[in-house]
Amino acid sequence: MPEETIPSKAKSVKSLTSFAKRSAQLAAGFACAIALVAGVPAVAGAQVLTTDDVCGKTADVRAITAENLPDIEATNALVMGKDGTVYYGRGADEQVKIASITKVMTAILTVENCKMDEKVTVSNAAATVGNSTAGLLEGDELTVEQALRGLMIPSGNDAAIALAEHVGKKIDPKTKDAVATFVKAMNERAKKLGCTGTVFENPHGLDFDEWAGDMHSTAHDVALMMQEAMKNDTFREVVASEDSWIEVTGA
């Protein structure tokens, strides 16, 4: 997703004290892409595979013919019911890169550790991370709820770092590296959810240049994370949004 430049809307509106309020419109993107499928990478064209799992056994063992199987493009996929029953899987336990789906765990830790009206201040590290962003600037201040919107709707890497710094300091007030503290908590939370094939190395999912590493997950683990995230009212409301405005107090 290309980097966004989000113009100021409220410079013409006078605000309290000397702060200028800025409203940033967030383009819908990542929220619509979240599903219980980790299709990384997608195969060229849809495929029907009799080796796919159907309720615990492969389709060929169940004598299910190709015309009765789903025709999907994903290399790795899983269909899980609300009760955790797995109805369908393709390479569901294969460890793959999940990119911005990483932000689901970032959101989980945020809603579990924060009140939605807490204030988050955007650091230089957050504002300059680049790639897909919510257009946050160094010194900006916004609520946790607004930062979650910046995280999930345009898949904002800036919001991911800002939240990781904020939550990391709450988890360990004495930490000298709040992001590292947050990432450690991400991995611990994943294990508690039963995610056996997941390793996080940052809060946004970037995996090149200074962010290159061995982060990975599986379609099955992504399903477990999504199942947990969807229990939260705020998360459900945010990912259901097609468009959103966030109000930011500029430095």
Q: Language-model features: where?
A:
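Preference for long, amphipathic alpha-helical scaffolds in soluble/luminal domains
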Residues: 3-4, 19, 23, 47
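Extracytoplasmic
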Residues: 226-251
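Active-site-adjacent loops and short helices of periplasmic peptidoglycan-processing enzymes
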Residues: 46-220, 230-233
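A generic structural signal for nonpolar/aromatic side chains embedded in well-ordered alpha-helices
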Residues: 36, 151, 238-239
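C-terminal segment of classical bacterial N-terminal signal peptides
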Residues: 34-43
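N-terminal targeting leaders characterized by basic, low-complexity, disordered sequences
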Residues: 1-9
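Bacterial N-terminal signal peptides that target proteins for export
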Residues: 9-30
